[in-house]
Every structure is written in C-alpha cells, then in structure tokens.
C-alpha cells in the first residue's frame, strides 16, 4: 500500500512538472497542498474564439486507481456541449486506466475547441441568448467554492467503473408561461453525483428539452454517515439561477433529489420575474412529490411552539 502511495505521489509530481514545461504560464497552481490545478485552453494562440478553463484535483490514488476530479468552466459551455465534452474525457480515462491522463485531456479539449471554431457555429459573444444580467450577480467561481465542490466529490467518489447503475425515474412538472417564455421542471431522486450525469443524458435525449434555451439544475444528496450534503448547481447560461434554486432546496431541506428547470425563451426579457418562475417550478414539483415534508413538519412544530409560548 505504501509503495502504491509513493508511486502515485511521484507520478503526480512528474506529470505536473511535465505540464508546466509544456504549457508554461498557462498551467496554474490553485492550491498545491490540495493538489488543485487549472489551465486555460483555447482553439488558437493568436485570436482565440473559443476558450475554457479546465480545473482539476488529483486524488491521492491517482493515477493508479482513480481519475482526476475535474471541472470545466466557460460561460458558453452548456447543455449538450458540456455533456459531449465530459463524456469524451471520461471515455479517454477508461481507455487509459492507471495512466497519467491530463495531457491527453488538455489536447482533447483543444481539439474540441478547434472543431467548434471550424464549424458554422458563431463565437460565444455572437450567440443569441436570453441572459439578463443583474447588478451583483457573480458569475465567477471562487477558489473556495471550487475546493469545496471538489472535496464534496471526493467524499462520495466518482463512479467510472459502474456502467450498470440504473437511471432514476424522472417526473415532469406543470409548465409556467409568461410573455412567450415557458418554464418546466423535471425531478428525479439521486443518491450519487454519477446519477446526476445519467439524468442529464436521459433528459437530453428529448429534443425539446435538449433545445431549451437554458436547463438550470440543482441537486442535494444527504450523507448520513457524515451528517453532511453533497450539493451543486448549474446556471446553464441563466446567470445565478442555479444558485437561487439550490438555495430554495436548502430552505425546503430537500434531500436526495435533483431538479432541472428548462426555460424556452420567447424573445421578451422578463427581468427578475424569470427567477420567480424558475423557483416556482422547482418548488411546485418538490412539493408535489413530497420532497419538502421535513420543512413543513418543522414549520408546523415551530408554529405550535410559538402558540404554546404565547399562552404561557
């Protein structure tokens, strides 16, 4: 065991040194103690059209027994593009089990960006969008948030080996329409982050959902042994919507569940009303399927306590 640990440490050191030599300043150390690194990758070194940031954490048992944990950050990387690229990276890992994989990942991402630049797909700044920027919205991912996200993933582990895990049942909520925009929630029980990917893949098989302007999601998984949660969210281009939806789920104490809200933009900006509709869709489907009973019971208990205190 000790020999394997030493081998992993040495191979990680050698890999990081090689990547630093190859990519120079593009390769950045976020937290050396936590083994968190990032690199900005573009389709061209001269006038890049497509750029994204790959952030990784190297677990103690990488590369011998587990993959790097990773996060892809780019405002334009959404929906099917994100899933396609993630699937490519994970398939590449499975084809090279036990090997150092970061260089291959970086070059695969670069190849993906070059292919996008050579298609008729316009650059990210030219794409039509329904994004409505609010003052105070924070689109950047802080180092603390990134570290916490990675640690959460490490607590539960990423399941690359189980290809037989069943896709949880997905239910669909009622639609809400306002000024030609339509919103609809989709809900599924989840007990692992791996199931989140399965659910997204399944939803994107539906062409209507796949072509939604935004598919915002949030999930919370309760880890009883640690009395803690694995939780995350995705705006999918609708700035801050994912965080707001996750906050709602925290208030409702929703556990072991994922909610995706699809928005089909109708050409008229809704302003703050869009957040109200997104959260109402999420709240309605959570209540309909009894994922906020704990909060309701707690509220009733609090109400009873207040009445009792008033009588005294």
UniProtKB/Swiss-Prot annotation:
The keyword Repressor applies. Residues 14-116 form the RWD domain. SUPFAM superfamilies: Ribosomal protein S5 domain 2-like (SSF54211), UBC-like (SSF54495). Gene3D superfamilies: Impact, N-terminal domain, Ubiquitin Conjugating Enzyme. Keywords: Cytoplasm, Differentiation, Neurogenesis, Repressor, Stress response, Translation regulation. Residues 118-128 have a biased composition (Polar residues). GO terms for cellular component: cytoplasm. One of its GO terms (biological process) is positive regulation of neuron differentiation. It comes from the Eukaryota. Ubiquitous both in embryo and adult. GO terms for molecular function: protein sequestering activity. Its main location: cytoplasm. Residues 118-138 are annotated as: Disordered. Pfam families: RWD, UPF0029. Belongs to the IMPACT family. In contrast to the mouse or rabbit ortholog, the IMPACT locus is not imprinted in Xenopus. This is Protein IMPACT. It comes from Xenopus laevis. The lineage of its organism: Eukaryota, Metazoa, Chordata, Craniata, Vertebrata. The gene is impact.
């Amino acid at each position: 065991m000790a020999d394997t640990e030493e081998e992993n440490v040495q191979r990680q050191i050698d890999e990081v040194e090689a990547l630093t030599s190859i990519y120079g300043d593009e390769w950045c150390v976020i937290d050396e103690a936590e083994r968190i690194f990032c690199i900005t990758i573009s389709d061209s070194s001269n006038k890049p059209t497509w750029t994204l940031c790959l952030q990784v954490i190297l677990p103690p048992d990488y590369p011998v027994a587990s993959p790097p944990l990773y996060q892809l950050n780019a405002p334009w990387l959404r929906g099917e593009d994100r899933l396609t690229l993630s699937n490519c990276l994970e398939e590449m890992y499975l084809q090279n089990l036990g090997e150092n994989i970061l260089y291959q990942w970086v070059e695969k991402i670069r190849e993906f960006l070059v292919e996008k630049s050579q298609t008729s797909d316009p650059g990210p700044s030219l794409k039509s969008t329904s994004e409505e920027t609010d003052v105070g919205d924070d689109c950047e991912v802080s180092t603390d948030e990134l570290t916490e996200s990675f640690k959460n993933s490490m607590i539960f582990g990423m399941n690359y080996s189980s290809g037989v895990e069943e896709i949880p049942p997905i239910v669909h909520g009622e639609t809400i329409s306002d000024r030609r925009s339509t919103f609809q929630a989709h809900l599924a029980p989840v007990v692992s982050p791996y199931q989140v990917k399965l659910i997204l893949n399944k939803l994107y098989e539906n062409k209507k959902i796949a072509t939604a302007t935004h598919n915002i999601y949030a999930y919370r998984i309760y880890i009883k042994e640690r009395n803690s949660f694995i939780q995350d969210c995705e705006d999918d281009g609708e700035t801050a919507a994912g965080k707001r939806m996750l906050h709602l789920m925290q208030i409702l104490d929703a556990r072991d569940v994922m909610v995706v809200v699809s928005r089909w933009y109708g050409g008229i900006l809704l302003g703050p009303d869009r957040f109200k509709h997104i959260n109402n869709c999420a709240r309605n489907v959570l209540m309909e399927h009894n994922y906020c009973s704990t909060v309701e019971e707690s509220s009733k208990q609090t109400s009873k306590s207040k009445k009792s205190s008033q009588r005294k």
